[in-house]
Amino acid sequence: MPKASHQDLRRSFRALTSSNACFHTASVFDPMSARIAADLGFEVGILGGSVASLQVLAAPDFALITLSEFVEQATRIGRVAQLPVIADADHGYGNALNVMRTVVELERAGISALTIEDTLLPAQFGRKSTDLISTAEGVGKIRAALEARVDPEMSIFARTNAAIIPVQEAISRVQQYQAAGADGITIVGIRDFDHLAQISEGVTVPLMLVTYGNPELHDNARLAEMGVRVCVHGHAAYFAAIKATYDCLREQRQILGNESNMSATELTHTYTQPEDYVEWARKFMNVNE
């Protein structure tokens, strides 16, 4: 079977987002998971920023991974992927000029689409990690991303967090990112379908929702009807891999019992040691959360 080119995959992603259906992402974090996802029939995969941080650094999602490290992992995936892969490019690794560099590097890596979010990252001195940049700066980042793109088939999605801002502000941000030329809008923190209807009013570009498995948003037909073309439930496959690795190694060391009682979430917390980073942020950055 002939191998699809990066541009073929980008066209496939655009065909998905131009359809009337809602597609669910596979969490892909290395070349093997990308091949498995394609073989199982997933239409699209996503390389999460949080997962890349875990895979490359064994570190929590505190914007610690560098652009180079993220691109290296994306390149490994892009080398073998036979499904479109979305890159969660966080804040674009800096200001609008950094965003341009991010787009150039991820396009070369073979990514089909990427998201640029308006969270203030990395965490700033004395500021909450959930603070957002201004809408004007967010618009500038999207315009810069579009300027840097060489292959017009690659999709640029603007991302915002509806859970931490008033509805009217979320509506304004979404509409301004659309007006800036974003190929789509990614929204995190939608509570239910009424919330989605409010925020997506007037949006004509494709929507991507990050739901983390919210049971209030499980009606796929309704998601599709409301313009959602991509739904990200989270990264269960990656956390299942952590759990399986732990249990296998534990058994090899002949610790009594084939399986531990620790969940994947508990294992991730144990081995990424987030409390250290929280303490360092409090100690050196005056961040108390």
UniProtKB/Swiss-Prot annotation:
<protein>
    <recommendedName>
        <fullName>Oxaloacetate decarboxylase</fullName>
        <ecNumber>4.1.1.112</ecNumber>
    </recommendedName>
</protein>
<dbReference type="GO" id="GO:0006107">
    <property type="term" value="P:oxaloacetate metabolic process"/>
</dbReference>
<feature type="binding site">
    <location>
        <position position="88"/>
    </location>
    <ligand>
        <name>Mg(2+)</name>
    </ligand>
</feature>
<keyword id="KW-0479">Metal-binding</keyword>
<dbReference type="InterPro" id="IPR039556">
    <property type="entry name" value="ICL/PEPM"/>
</dbReference>
<keyword id="KW-0210">Decarboxylase</keyword>
<feature type="binding site">
    <location>
        <position position="159"/>
    </location>
    <ligand>
        <name>substrate</name>
    </ligand>
</feature>
<dbReference type="InterPro" id="IPR015813">
    <property type="entry name" value="Pyrv/PenolPyrv_kinase-like_dom"/>
</dbReference>
<dbReference type="GO" id="GO:0019629">
    <property type="term" value="P:propionate catabolic process, 2-methylcitrate cycle"/>
</dbReference>
<dbReference type="GO" id="GO:0008948">
    <property type="term" value="F:oxaloacetate decarboxylase activity"/>
</dbReference>
<dbReference type="InterPro" id="IPR040442">
    <property type="entry name" value="Pyrv_kinase-like_dom_sf"/>
</dbReference>
<feature type="binding site">
    <location>
        <position position="235"/>
    </location>
    <ligand>
        <name>substrate</name>
    </ligand>
</feature>
<feature type="binding site">
    <location>
        <position position="50"/>
    </location>
    <ligand>
        <name>substrate</name>
    </ligand>
</feature>
<comment type="subunit">
    <text>Homotetramer; dimer of dimers.</text>
</comment>
<dbReference type="Pfam" id="PF13714">
    <property type="entry name" value="PEP_mutase"/>
</dbReference>
<dbReference type="GO" id="GO:0042866">
    <property type="term" value="P:pyruvate biosynthetic process"/>
</dbReference>
<dbReference type="GO" id="GO:0046421">
    <property type="term" value="F:methylisocitrate lyase activity"/>
</dbReference>
<keyword id="KW-0456">Lyase</keyword>
<comment type="similarity">
    <text>Belongs to the isocitrate lyase/PEP mutase superfamily. Oxaloacetate decarboxylase family.</text>
</comment>
<dbReference type="InterPro" id="IPR023687">
    <property type="entry name" value="Oxaloacetate_deCOase_bac"/>
</dbReference>
<dbReference type="GO" id="GO:0000287">
    <property type="term" value="F:magnesium ion binding"/>
</dbReference>
<comment type="function">
    <text>Catalyzes the decarboxylation of oxaloacetate into pyruvate. Seems to play a role in maintaining cellular concentrations of bicarbonate and pyruvate.</text>
</comment>
<keyword id="KW-0460">Magnesium</keyword>
